[in-house]
Amino acid sequence: MEYTYQYSWIIPFIPLPVPILIGMGLLLFPTATKNHRRVWSFPSILLLSMVMLLSVYLSIQQINRSFIYQYVWSWTINNDFSLEFGHLIDPLASIMLILITTVGILVLFYSDNYMSHDQGYLRFFAYLSFFNTSMLGLVTSSNLIQIYIFWELVGMCSYLLIGFWFTRPIAATACQKAFVTNRVGDFGLLLGILGLYWITGSFEFRDLFEIVNNLIDNNNQVHFLFVTLCSFLLFAGAVAKSAQFPLHVWLPDAMEGPTPISALIHAATMVAAGIFLVARLLPLFVITPYIMNLISLIGIITVLLGATLALAQKDIKRSLAYSTMSQLGYMMLALGMGSYRAALFHLITHAYSKALLFLGSGSIIHSMESIVGYSPDKSQNMVLMGGLKKHVPITKTAFLVGTLSLCGIPPLACFWSKDEILNDSWLYSPIFAIIACSTAGFTAFYMFRVYLLTFDGHLNVHFQNYSGQKSSSVYSISLWGKQVPKRIQNPFCLLNLLTMNNNESTSFFWNNKCKLDGNVKKRIRPFITVTHFPNRKTFSYPHESDNTMLFSLFVLVLFTLFVAAIGIPFNQEGSDCDILSKLLNPSINLLHQNSNNFTDWYEFVTNASFSVSIALLGIFIATFLYKPIYSSLQNFNLLNSFYKRSANRVMWDKIQNWIYDWSYNRGYIDSFYTISLTGGIRGLAELSHFFDRRVIDGILNGFGLTSFFLGESLKYFGGGRISSYLLLYSIFIFIFLLMDSFFTNLPFFVLCQFLDSSFSMSISGFLLYENFLYENF
């Protein structure tokens, strides 16, 4: 066992040969490497599988022995400074290793088919393997310096993968946005690391925690404030990496990368890195109560914000991205409350559920591309979907399992972990608990909204009702594909938000009359306006994905069904079946938490029934609003008559419009950043440019112009006439003496006498000089 731990340092470097060999192959043998590009998926999967087996073995040893292994190499630079590098294998590292490798293998297996048509296939697998290497190095780091190095490598890989299709301007902009936003957090992380080293003299976790504890125990207020500041800076790095408020704005734009990358980034790697950092540094944060309160506050804000922003998204991947943001907020909330076990439990269950949802969405997008062509604006648009359950039944089943899990429906994975966080939130703060429980209802609503828009009803892409010609007939098409005759003037249309522009003030349920162009002056606005897209259609309907993609979905379904078994807290006296608690025992003792908590069935049912009822309410509302049966209710005008009786219809419309605008415009946070930060920086740049060109250059150019015009003016006085020189000489002498008499109070008559005598002498001298010139020349 000791032998295995000693060589565990090689874990991060096992996948590294793949990007190195791909790069060398493209440089030395480009034609052969490209011709046999599909071969490279095998070593990528094989090497990561080796890491997974080693990680599972280490985790088994952790469970059986509750053992923490750390090995450090010291590099002495001089007598006063040395760097220490090593690796740390503890329960947290073991959990993250299994999470990264299992999800990574399935993503690699899935990507082999998903990216087979792409010219950047080799580049994709090189990036992906290096991404896995960086993340494995991050979770096994034994000190803050190593964490920062691999932290930056993870950020670099995410930049490359988000902008994988860099020829698309929107993808290039998205990767730059992610990179710049994360630079804010990374700068804070670097300052926090340097600050802690300055006060403790060590980067190692154990030494750092011990020294900081001693400093705080001495009741030194200066040390406490400085440690609090450093902790805040460290937390800023986690906020950016895990897309927490207010540095979350990069997350939805990260969807411009390939879908397998979205699954990896939003499930087990990049966004999980911030949660991992807070969990790793939790002993430091625990001794600074203000930081713990800040962590929980940021977490609960992100929980609610992510859920509300997901309500009106048309893009299926953006909806899942905001869902990820909200679920990461739950984990951050749990860490801020001190619920270390609940946070890691939800990290595990959410990783597999969200990977299943993203890979399922990739299967959906893959099937839609055969109809609408390659265009993310069309293939990812849920407005053009619908009725896919008849065409992609396996994907539908897998997506439904992931949706139910994320909604918190038992016995699926996320139910157990989310319920534990909700229960702990009632003990921490009733206000936070109310917000967290309400968000659970929002989660169920928007996730079933995504499911119903995608799989129920009819395929909406086949209803192309406006071709841009005068003679084209206009239909008002309901969400589920049923053509409504043009004579209907005020149909009660479900969720008009799907076709609204950002500046429109249309309610959720009522259509407006609006101008479209010169061909159509005024018409009833259709629920879905689909322009005819000229493309080659290989299939008239979507088709199920290949078996290699479905295999990854099947394995993730199994994980979603059974992974929660490792953490179900039904421990009774005399039995201990909670594997997660046994694994986390060393960490729990480090945090001074009691691990002997037993949960009986009555308490569990009481707590779970409330959260499940909220989730079912959200599902019911989504089903009521989005289920195809609504079309028949609309035809009978049942909801129309009910809605028209409302006395507060105008107010209700305004509320719905506000909710839609808030969600679709990303809470106006991006706009605020654009106006305040981007606009402010541009304004400062323009001011600097004006000051440089007009003031600095103006002063220098002013001296030059003044000298030029003065020289041009004086050259006319140098005509060669002595009388002119004499006149100027006399004038300057008079001015000088006049100023001198003003400052020295010299009598004026003395000045006149001096001027008269000097003038006479000057005239005599000039006359003699002129006479001399006349006689000799």
Curated annotation (Swiss-Prot):
Q: Which reaction does it catalyse?
A: a plastoquinone + NADH + (n+1) H(+)(in) = a plastoquinol + NAD(+) + n H(+)(out); a plastoquinone + NADPH + (n+1) H(+)(in) = a plastoquinol + NADP(+) + n H(+)(out)
Topology with respect to the bilayer: Multi-pass membrane protein
- State the compartments where it is located: Plastid, Chloroplast thylakoid membrane
| Record's keyword terms, sorted | Chloroplast, Membrane, NAD, NADP, Plastid, Plastoquinone, Quinone, Thylakoid, Translocase, Transmembrane, Transmembrane helix, Transport
Record EC number: 7.1.1.-
Q: State one molecular function term (GO).
A: NADH dehydrogenase (ubiquinone) activity
Instruction: Note whether Transmembrane helix occurs among the keywords.
Output: yes
What the entry lists under Pfam families is as follows: Proton_antipo_C (PF01010), Proton_antipo_M (PF00361), Proton_antipo_N (PF00662)
Q: Transmembrane region positions?
A: 9-29, 40-60, 89-109, 125-145, 147-167, 185-205, 220-240, 259-279, 290-312, 328-348, 355-375, 397-417, 426-446, 550-570, 604-624, 731-751
Catalytic class of the enzyme: translocase
Q: Which biological processes are named by the entry's GO terms?
A: ATP synthesis coupled electron transport; electron transport coupled proton transport
One cellular component term (GO) for this entry is: chloroplast thylakoid membrane
The function of this protein is: NDH shuttles electrons from NAD(P)H:plastoquinone, via FMN and iron-sulfur (Fe-S) centers, to quinones in the photosynthetic chain and possibly in a chloroplast respiratory chain. The immediate electron acceptor for the enzyme in this species is believed to be plastoquinone. Couples the redox reaction to proton translocation, and thus conserves the redox energy in a proton gradient.
Q: Which family does it belong to?
A: Belongs to the complex I subunit 5 family.
Summary of subunit composition and partner proteins:
NDH is composed of at least 16 different subunits, 5 of which are encoded in the nucleus.
- Recorded protein name is NAD(P)H-quinone oxidoreductase subunit 5, chloroplastic
What's the source species for this entry?
Answer: Oenothera elata subsp. hookeri (Hooker's evening primrose)
The gene behind this protein is ndhF
